[in-house]
Amino acid sequence: MGEALRGLKRTIMCGEPRENNIGEKVTVMGWVQRKRNLGGLIFVDLRDRTGIMQIVFGEEINKEAFEKSDNVKSEYCIAVTGEIVKRQSPNNDMETGAVELKGEDIKILSESETPPIYIKEGLDASENVRLKYRYLDLRRPDMQKIFMIRHKTCKVVRDFLDENGFLEMETPILTKSTPEGARDYLVPSRNYKGMFYALPQSPQIFKQLLMVSGYDKYFQITKCFRDEDLRANRQPEFTQIDMELSFVEEDDVIDLNEKLLAKVFKEVAGIDVKLPIERMPYKIAMEKYGSDKPDLRFGMEINDLTEAVKNSEFKVFKGAIEAGGSVRAIKAENCATMGRKQIDKLQDFVKTYKAKGLAWIAYKEDEIKSPIAKFLTEEEMKAILEKMDAKVGDLILIVGDKNNVVFESLGALRLHLAKELDIINKDEFRFVWITEFPLLAYNEEEGRYQAEHHPFTAIMDEDIDLLDTDPGKVRAKAYDIVLNGEELGGGSIRIHDSKLQEKMFSVLGFTKEKAWERFGFLLEAFKFGPPPHGGLAYGLDRMIMFLAGTENIKDVITFPKNQNAFCPLTEAPNVVDENQLEELGIKKIEKED
């Protein structure tokens, strides 16, 4: 049984003592990292979240403490009181390496079994074991650094927004299900049997209602929930830095958030963000990079070859152009020597993005090699090489198809090749705002338009008339902030006119009755003088990944789920008692074989 503190107070953290503390009598508390018994002396490295302190016990220092210290093992939780002295053999690899603590008294607060994982940096244990024993995983110094970064980030964000007149306000967690997009997590109601709350996918509607309420600058750091299939770096519950402002336009929201990003990245990670951040319309991003989340740390931009091959008799190119598509290409420098097997793998790669194939031209020193050369005239080949600014040693990779297939396949191929060729500067941070998103996307399966972002996004002023005549061409007052090919956050100016909002619901295929059934409370609120407003939300978890330099979202969440949305630690979700289900009016139906 562990000893009680009995009034003993910690006076200094393990990672704090320096030479200016020599001579001080202190008490430290923490976990035993390791113990070394050298006969007449016992050395213990004691760890807490600030670092490690070496403690020396000896018969000449205190015989009772010396004998007691011999009983401690790794991960025992102990308290030690003694004097800070100069270390005879300094350890320059430790921040406290110039000093050590002479152990005059020791309390063993609790013992530890042999841990199933080593408490050290750079752990190579399996993810499942780490998640099952997450409380031990979180003791590791590299994990503790991450959560100190997370804390500091939240503090910097709160301080900045407070200084800029924002109010931190909370919105409901139990709310109404308005299915449009990802699936909701549903919570059954005991009082209203057969009815359900939904956990919020975002605070979107409530923060708009706060604008109607006159709280013109709102923010919160809040949990959101989406019941979707978990891809890499997705979690069913995640944290947003959410904000909304009244009486603003796009530039106002963007300018404020550039200052916020610059402050966060500088103060938390020492990274300078060059302002103003580049802005790029969605159309340009797709045409040049094949993605609305372009990674700008390398070139390999997509070029349009449609004009150069518009008269080509090559069936793939001709068919794509006649069908209203295009022919486009990327250039892989110094890759003309790539073997046929490697190119075949690239062809298989683009086919996963529905491309029918991948044409290629290798610009070698003594020849231009290509399986499509026989289908191209000399003028067409020359035009392609000029358009691509090709030089000896370059490999040109071409896709001809519908535009969306061309963009998606070449955009993915561009990223794939950059990683394979190792041409991405991992120390660079390239921000870009993507603007002028399409407002709508047509769902061919359902035969209707769907909102690209959400149904509350405002329309660019010059495109309002297109909502009646050509909805697919309407652009939104929406903006995403992208960093190194990852979406860091996104937002928009919102519709604040009830008639326009009703019209938007109509374009999305909602009857008036259905729109009022789902969103009547918002439409009703818009009858009472709503201000122009807009906002933005960041994925805090993804932001911390960049600031902490990790590529795994589970590293930045204290108790994450695995790829199957299961918690190995608590074994949630779990079966509940029948009486709990009965109270909720729920009956389980067994699946038939």
Swiss-Prot record:
SUPFAM superfamilies: Class II aaRS and biotin synthetases, GAD domain-like, Nucleic acid-binding proteins. Its EC number is 6.1.1.12. InterPro entries: Aa-tRNA-synt_II, aa-tRNA-synth_II, aa-tRNA-synth_II/BPL/LPL, Asp-tRNA-ligase_1, Asp-tRNA-ligase_1_N, Asp/Asn-tRNA-synth_IIb, AspRS_core, GAD-like_sf. It is found in: Cytoplasm. Residues 204-207 are annotated as: Aspartate. The keyword Oxidoreductase does not apply. It catalyses: tRNA(Asp) + L-aspartate + ATP = L-aspartyl-tRNA(Asp) + AMP + diphosphate. Keywords: Aminoacyl-tRNA synthetase, ATP-binding, Cytoplasm, Ligase, Nucleotide-binding, Protein biosynthesis. Its main location: cytoplasm. The keyword Nucleotide-binding applies. One of its GO terms (biological process) is aspartyl-tRNA aminoacylation. Transmembrane segments: none annotated. GO terms for cellular component: cytoplasm. GO terms for molecular function: aspartate-tRNA ligase activity; ATP binding; catalytic activity, acting on a protein; nucleic acid binding; transferase activity. Signal peptide: none annotated. L-aspartate binds at residues 180, 226, 453, 494. Pfam families: GAD (PF02938), tRNA-synt_2 (PF00152), tRNA_anti-codon (PF01336). ATP binds at residues 226-228, 235, 487, 539-542. Catalyzes the attachment of L-aspartate to tRNA(Asp) in a two-step reaction: L-aspartate is first activated by ATP to form Asp-AMP and then transferred to the acceptor end of tRNA(Asp). Homodimer. HAMAP family: Asp_tRNA_synth_type1. Belongs to the class-II aminoacyl-tRNA synthetase family. Type 1 subfamily. This is Aspartate--tRNA ligase. It comes from Clostridium botulinum (strain 657 / Type Ba4).
